[in-house]
Amino acid sequence: MVSTTSLQPALRLLVGLLFFSTWFATADVTAQAYPSARSGGNYMHAFYLPPAPTATPWAPAWAPDGQSVAVSMQGSIWEVEVETGVALQLTSGRGYHSSPNFSPDGRWLVYTSDFDNKRIQLEVMNIETGEVFRLTDDDQIYLDPVFSPDGKQIAYVSTQPSGYFNIYIRNFFDGSWVAPPVAVTSDNDFGRSRLYFGAWDMHITPTWVPDGSELLLVSNRDVPLGSGNVLRVPAIENGIEFAETVLSEQSLYRTRPDVSIDGKRFVYSSTSGSADQYNNLYVQPTVGGEPYKMTFFESDAFHPRWSPDGENIAFIGNSEGLSRLMMLETYGGKITHVSINELRHREPMGMVSVKILNSDDNQLTPNRVHLKASDGKFYAPLDAYARAGHVGDLVFHNDGEFEVQVPVGDMEFSVLKGFEFHPMTKSVNVIENEVIHLEVKLERLINMGKRGWHNASTHVHANYGGNLHNTLDNLKFMSRAEGQDLVLEQVANKDNRILDYHLFEGGGGAHSSSEEDQVVVVGQEYRPPFYGHVFMFGMKDHLISPFVTGYEGTAVESLYPSNTDMLLKAKAQGAVTGYVHPFLGEIDPLEGSLGGGKGFVVDAALGATDALEWSDASTSGFYPLYAVWNSGLRITATGGEDSISSLHRSKLIGSFRTYVYTGSAGLSMEAWFDGLLKGRALVTSGPILEMAVGSSLPGDTIEFSDDRGTLNISGRLRSIVDV
């Protein structure tokens, strides 16, 4: 398209035109997960709720005989023989199953069933007959079911009746409830909103003491930071009124206490009050006392469970990246991996083997796969880093070929590779005990690199305390699968923890893991909740510390220093800086509270920030951006989705990104950030808009000798989906 118009003189006219047009071509793909929950939000979904897409073990629970452990895997519950590694599939059918727990007599198995990231229900299976009974069937969330020591009751978490997380006990007999629920806890308002946790208290992860008279649970009642302390609570109606705190520390949903067979101690997962980067296992007296550290990983240990004889602790480790079933010898300390050597399915299965080729050279190419089998569920290869996007899509990346075992019948899958290749969708009829071989060729929409444009998300995190353990190599792999030219990883805090600080290298240049066709930069997200979060890339000497200000109840609660102070310190080291995800929604933040980027306009005026980032398709950021542009300030709009790839639920890497024109300078950190500072950038969540005014490019200044002039504006929009 070509049009001619008369315009007033404008500073960097093309920046505004190109960004504005590209932005409104994006698709606003949003969906509310678990709408019945009125508290918790994204962090609770990622750190606490059962992971739907996991192809590897999660949520271990011992069988009463101590010979096997039930786990959640591939959307079903499996029983794994500890000695042989043989896994028997116990459940199948609708929903994604997790959080298993056996009745003391071994006759019943209770578990959760997740339906399309909207609701989570309780079901129970008769182990002898395989018959399944629905304990709940509504629009609420039910979690953490656990049988009482006598098998006559089940304690669980529910969002009934008001959408907040409370603990209930209910009598159970022969596959069904036999009495109304007893509310051990109830809704309680902290009195004001807490950072990331809101005003309403949560009560989660109950576990019984051996005599059945009390529960240990986790609650943030009267706690300003974190998901809560461990409380000892009578297993009666309103037992929370008699609660005693037995462990007080800042936590993040991972504690999950489990009481020993003698009732004297409990094992739990902890970062030691956020002192450590990773979760390890600890034990402590059930009446309170000092913790004792049991593991010393440079990765995470989650979900510990005592064996029936107390001699071993089953847990989930992620030292190899994916979750694995692990065993800790209680007295002796030996740690072993319970390798799953054989899968025995309930339903007939077949294998699908796929190769994905790049049409440019007919070579294997990394990509992303969305897959649905004949039972309506997602499946992934057993070695895949499977995850859920923030809208609920279940995906895995692969290096250009994969094999996956799925139920017989029609399977459909889609293959995608960033914004510059057309997606492909294929269907196949899977046949029992056969291998179906397929080849998919991805056709290119456009090659922006050949046109001098190179892309990256400006907001990527490798690790953030998630179920998975991420590495720069894996981050690079996923970025290649998404067609990104640069990987801009950010070190960041989560509460008092600092994640990935060991990845930072001084010098101000590209990371040593960079390759000729893929640049890696390790920067920092500085995250004060009041002034707004910012990125800092290219620091020559050290990370900026403290990583946050204004955290209630900590030594950095003060609002000093300001963002201006810290941004200028980063710039003194050569950093490029920008405000990240600062303005959400559609309302002008300049007319209200200034949104999440309260320091942006001031820092733009003071030259402390270079960029303003978009991480979703909201429009509120246009108001402050055009305000600074109209004031003659050279601020560049950037795109970065804030993906956190160690979380099982997070935005997918590269789903919002920045294209920067480097021209003949090619692909390098220096050329890319130099182009960004010059405003030669566009933001997109998919559609690619090329635009020019005459021979001028984004970032150029167009001046007229008189009050009016004529400009030729040309542009072309390309998109892999309809816009």
Language model features: what each stretch is:
Residues L13-A25:
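Bacterial N-terminal signal peptides
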Residues M44-W78:
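Beta-strand-rich domains and repeat architectures in extracellular enzymes and scaffolds
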Residues P53-T54, S72-W78, S92-H97, V110-V124, ...:
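A flexible loop/linker signature enriched in serine peptidases of the S9 family
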Residues D65-Q67, D105-R107, D150-K152, D211-S213, ...:
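Short coil/turn segments that connect the beta-strands within blades of beta-propeller domains
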Residues K334-M351, S359-D360:
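Beta-strand-rich domain onsets/edges
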Residues N358-K377, Y385-A386, V395-E401, D410, ...:
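C-terminal functional module detector
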Residues R451-A637, E641-H648:
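Catalytic cores of extracellular degradative/oxidative enzymes
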